[in-house]
Amino acid sequence: MMKNIIELILSIGKVDRRWIFVVIGLAVLLPLFFPLGLPIRATNATQLVYDAVDDLEPNSKVLVSFEYGPSTKPEIHPMAIGILRHLFTNNQKVYVTCLWPDGQFMAEDALTEIAEQEFGLTYGEDYVLLGFRPGNEAVVKGIVSNLRKLYTTDARGTLVDQIPMMANVNKVKDFDFIFSASAGYPGTIEWVQYAADPTGVPMSTGTTSIQVNDVMPYVQLSLIHI
């Protein structure tokens, strides 16, 4: 029996490599022309996030923070796009902050695609990009205590007092929900520790796979819907 297996393995090694390339090519091309149509099932974690956002009342104020850059864009950006699309579909007001410098560029890209091109929304009335501020977790603490002291202008240089949707928004408790699109520090953990947990504002996050082990304890404590 073992001898037959060894002979089979050796015979495979003698196959003309061109046949191997043909098989690989067919394996790639056939599904493109004849899609298998396999169902896409949401995981329990994904469903929790969806339900948490879906349960928000229309015109709820949602703070979305961008904490990733080009290196993690392939992993995080689709989540950011998805959450923005879901929020705007449900007529929520979106306030965008950035704990990373690159996060502002990611946010501008996502808002241009979804808010402007897909939904045709009005800046300052339906969404606003407050932008990046240096300071890591100190920025989160500033938003918790006095957002207007930290953000006197938005990313476009417009005075916050002149932005219609900023009326009656002064601190993190004025928001109905927080979403962190995070690739690391500062990010999800800081939002939980300094904002969501102390104030009770519900929160969710989209993180890189490498952060899951760090974030899951907060999920188990129901501090994050992930």
Where are these regions (language model features)?
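Membrane-embedded segments
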Residues: 71-122
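Alpha-helical transmembrane signal-anchor/signal-peptide segments
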Residues: 38-55
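Charge-patterned, long linear interaction tracts outside catalytic cores
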Residues: 153-213
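A substrate-binding/cap region within the structured catalytic cores of diverse enzymes
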Residues: 106-175, 182
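Short extracytoplasmic
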Residues: 50-78
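Hydrophobic alpha-helical transmembrane signal-anchor segments
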Residues: 11-35
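Conserved small/polar residues in nucleotide/adenosyl-binding loops
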Residues: 224-226
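Cytosolic juxtamembrane amphipathic/interface segments immediately preceding
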Residues: 3-12
